[in-house]
């Protein structure tokens, strides 16, 4: 069961509304192949109950191939927001391919069974997936031009998964928190294919993924034990077991720069600056500034107030300021004038009007006017959505302030775009390196 923002109510699982025997969640490649194998052997769909990364409805919840954990029923979470918060915590904790259990939720006389997620694909399997003959065109169903294709047509995905731990982001549910990545050879092969496209002008727009500078799991223990329950790898402080290493990503970008027909290789996906700062070797940071920024680098501090950042699952603002100072120094050393563009979010649970004023003061002090500000909207499954709906932080079951009133949400957002309000015609300024 999940909170639906558009209906402003808790809805039951989509499996109860869709005429389907089985649901595949996550990236789905391994689960889909295994389902196909069993169906080819005439196994009835209702007997396919033990595949990771799948969910199904059962009369009692028995029969899953995984250890079951019960969470509050659909009826309970509809009636009691505390029960909803408890259910969210259970679902989040068990979303792990190694230590996770099957989550059972009774609903209207039947039981939803959500098996643990599938294990990440191996590097070899991920390479094979990206070696398939993609045409890099929009689907034929689209009869008109799709402008967004131009940015992604000549971009390359090199990794999958994210251990960043942002509470408002659903990526952990789609791709998992364990990072896996393609081999350098696989990415280079794709770059060589790009150079054969008549539309290619020599510029690879992005070499990234959910977080561009992740290439491997955050620590060696994850492959044996899974992700730590109830802990984040990066926030509010980096884990002491964090393995911050950009050497392979640096080598990948160096290889791409040497591909015949490639003029420039840019990194436009989100860089996790907190992870970057943990790497004692700063070669990647220097090469990023030297070769891979197309005028401006986008990063996501999201806010400047510590309490708000804690609710978001983000590092504190002093980490961003430290990164900004080092970024300035590297640009000055190389004689470059490149900008830093921070992504910001308004009205996240825990953010008050006073907190937005403090962020507006920072923007005023730095002369920065964001052209775009993300106003928080709840999306199914995330911890932040649970906070929004219940007013409870599911991690520790404590109350959270929530800006639900449309007027206050609009005001919080407007404070971050203060120059627009007073109609100043001075050109928009970025966080300039000058």
Regions from the PLM with identified roles:
Residues 1-107, 115, 401:
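Glycine-rich beta-alpha loop elements in corrinoid/cobalamin-binding modules
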Residues 21, 187, 299, 373:
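Conserved, mostly hydrophobic/aromatic
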Residues 48-70, 182, 195-230, 385-392:
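Terminal amphipathic helices with adjacent charged low-complexity linkers/tails
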Residues 85-155:
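N-terminal [4Fe-4S]-dependent radical SAM core
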Residues 143-170, 203:
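N-terminal pre-triad scaffold of radical SAM enzymes
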Residues 193-341, 345-349:
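Conserved SAM/AdoMet-binding glycine-rich loop
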Residues 349-364:
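Catalytic cores of alpha/beta
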Residues 422-433:
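Single conserved hydrophobic/aromatic residue that forms the stacking wall/gate
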């Amino acid at each position: 069961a999940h909170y639906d923002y558009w209906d402003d109510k808790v809805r039951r699982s989509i499996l109860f509304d869709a005429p389907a025997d089985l649901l595949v969640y996550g990236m789905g490649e391994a689960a889909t192949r295994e389902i196909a194998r069993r169906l080819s052997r005439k196994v009835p769909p209702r007997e396919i109950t033990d595949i990771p990364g799948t969910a199904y409805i059962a009369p009692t919840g028995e029969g899953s191939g995984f250890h079951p954990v019960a969470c509050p029923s659909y009826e309970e979470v509809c009636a009691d927001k505390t029960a909803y918060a408890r259910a969210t915590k259970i679902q989040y904790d068990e979303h792990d391919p190694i230590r996770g259990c099957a989550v059972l939720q009774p609903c209207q006389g039947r039981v939803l069974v959500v098996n643990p997620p599938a294990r990440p694909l191996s590097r070899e399997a991920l390479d094979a997936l990206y070696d398939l003959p993609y045409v890099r065109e929009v689907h034929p169903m689209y009869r008109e031009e799709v402008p967004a294709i131009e940015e992604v047509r000549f971009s390359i995905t090199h990794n999958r998964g994210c251990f960043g731990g942002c509470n408002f982001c659903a990526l952990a549910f789609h791709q998992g928190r364990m990072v896996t990545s393609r081999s350098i050879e696989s990415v280079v092969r794709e770059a060589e294919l790009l150079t054969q496209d008549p539309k290619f002008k020599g510029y690879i727009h992005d070499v990234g993924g959910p977080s561009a500078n992740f290439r491997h799991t955050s620590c060696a223990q994850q492959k044996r034990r899974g992700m730590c329950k109830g802990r984040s790898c990066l926030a509010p402080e980096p884990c002491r077991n964090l393995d911050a290493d950009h050497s392979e990503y640096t080598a990948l970008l160096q290889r791409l720069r040497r591909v015949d027909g490639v003029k420039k290789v840019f990194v436009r996906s989100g860089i996790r600056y907190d992870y970057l700062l943990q790497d004692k070797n700063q070669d990647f940071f220097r090469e990023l500034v030297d070769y891979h920024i197309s005028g401006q680098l986008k990063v996501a501090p999201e806010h400047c107030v510590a309490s708000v950042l804690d609710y978001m699952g983000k590092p504190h603002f002093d980490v961003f300021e430290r990164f900004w100072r080092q970024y300035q120094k590297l640009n000055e050393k190389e004689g470059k004038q490149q900008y830093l563009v921070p992504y910001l979010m308004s009205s996240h649970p825990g953010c008050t009007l006073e907190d937005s004023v403090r962020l507006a003061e920072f923007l005023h002090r730095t002369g920065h006017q964001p052209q775009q500000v993300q106003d928080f909207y709840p999306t199914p499954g995330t911890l932040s959505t649970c906070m929004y709906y219940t007013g409870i932080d599911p991690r520790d079951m404590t109350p959270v302030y929530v800006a639900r009133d449309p007027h206050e949400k609009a005001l919080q957002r407007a404070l971050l775009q203060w120059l627009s309000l007073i109609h100043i015609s001075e050109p928009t300024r970025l966080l300039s390196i000058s």
